[in-house]
A protein has these predicted regions:
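Eukaryote-skewed repeat-based solenoidal scaffolds used as protein-protein interaction platforms
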Residues: 2-220, 226
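Residue-level detector of short, conserved catalytic/binding motifs and their immediate flanks
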Residues: 121, 235, 289
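Alpha-helical oligomerization segments
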Residues: 191-277
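Disulfide-bonded cysteine-rich modules in secreted/extracellular proteins
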Residues: 274-287
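Extracellular/lumenal glycan-associated surfaces
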Residues: 286-298
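Extended, polar beta-sheet/loop recognition surfaces of beta-rich domains
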Residues: 297-326
Length: 326
């Protein structure tokens, strides 16, 4: 890169830690790694354990590249479109992992592990801000699993979008998330802002257990683990609870432009992304595609427009078919 390109990259980046040369090297790495992983899938197609591991690596790479592109300053309109690729990669991983485990509701994320928990909250939060139509699919990654309905922050983030969320007083990781739960539960705008400031102030030091912690110190032409430090869930809460973020919007880990984008752009409408279609048994299918009952992955089936939707005898209650994808 020449000096002009370097300066342009520095000005565009959303976080000052990102080295432009490292960014361009990592983009090349992820693209090459994608080719290598696809070849590994071909070579190991008969070994389900290996297929699961490879799809997990693919999903990690796609999400990390998405985050790195955000950190580098890519336009949100482009990232909004590409976020579906991240979700689809995790769906493929979940599909093969569930086959391997012999459990149709096996979770793609283990909330007891901080890396998994942070990443799941990131997917949910980014979707709230950019692609609310993808939230049912993201929830499908942990729906009906041992972690579904067990974490207060997850329930708070998803309750406006996913039915049958619970009011609970338990969570998997106390700090820093206690500050954010306090923010949600506070009675006044002033208290919420103070709690959010505490959350952002303390967020990074409690991420020490994550594999990417302090990765900005090891950026080089041969790679590294840094793709940005972002408290995505703080932005989601600020948006959902309409917080005035003037006093904390310039905090290093607060993705302020995502909140501004979400406030300026209405959610993608149902005609473009009809993920919110709901149909009862005996009613005609309004759109050809994949449907499932209550975000329960094992019920997923494909129906043709005009086909009568069936009743299923489930222990989860009434059958309500929800559109997933074309």
């Amino acid at each position: 890169m020449d000096e002009h390109e370097l300066e342009s990259s520095r000005e565009a980046r959303r976080q000052r830690f990102l080295d432009p040369n490292y960014y361009h090297a990592m983009v090349g790495f992820y693209l090459e790694d994608a080719k290598d992983l696809q070849q590994q899938l071909i070579d190991n197609s008969s070994y389900l354990d290996s297929v699961v591991r490879i799809h997990e690596s693919i999903a990690y790479d796609i999400f990390e590249l998405f985050s790195l592109r955000y950190t580098a300053g890519e336009p949100l309109g482009k990232l909004r479109h590409d976020f579906e690729d991240v979700v689809a990669a995790y769906e493929r991983y979940a599909k093969y992992d569930r086959q391997n485990e012999g459990e149709p509701d096996w979770p793609a994320f283990s909330f007891t592990h901080i890396d998994d928990y942070v990443r799941c909250l990131a997917l949910v939060s980014i979707a709230i801000l950019l692609r609310q139509d993808l939230l049912p699919r993201i929830h499908g990654l942990i729906a009906e699993s041992a972690f579904d309905g067990q974490d207060a922050l997850y329930e708070e983030l998803t309750k406006k979008f996913i039915p049958d969320r619970l009011e609970i007083d338990q969570w998997y990781h106390n700090l820093p998330y206690r500050y954010l739960l306090d923010c949600i539960d506070s009675d006044t705008a002033e208290e919420r802002i103070a709690d959010m400031q505490s959350y952002l102030k303390n967020w990074y030091k409690y991420m020490k257990g994550c594999g990417w912690y302090d990765s900005h110190k090891n950026q080089g032409p041969e790679g590294g683990g840094y793709f940005g430090y972002w408290a995505w869930e703080a932005a989601a809460v600020a948006y959902l609870y309409d917080l005035d973020d003037t006093s904390f919007r310039d905090h290093l880990v607060y993705p302020k432009d995502l909140v501004a984008f979400a406030r300026q752009h209405a959610p993608l409408d149902q005609e473009q992304h009809p993920a919110q279609y709901r149909v009862l048994p005996g009613e005609p299918c309004p759109k050809t595609g994949e449907w499932m009952v209550g975000h329960t992955p094992r019920t997923a089936r494909r129906f043709t427009k005009g086909e009568m939707m069936p009743e299923l005898n489930l222990d989860t209650g009434a059958t309500i078919w929800m559109f997933v994808r074309d």
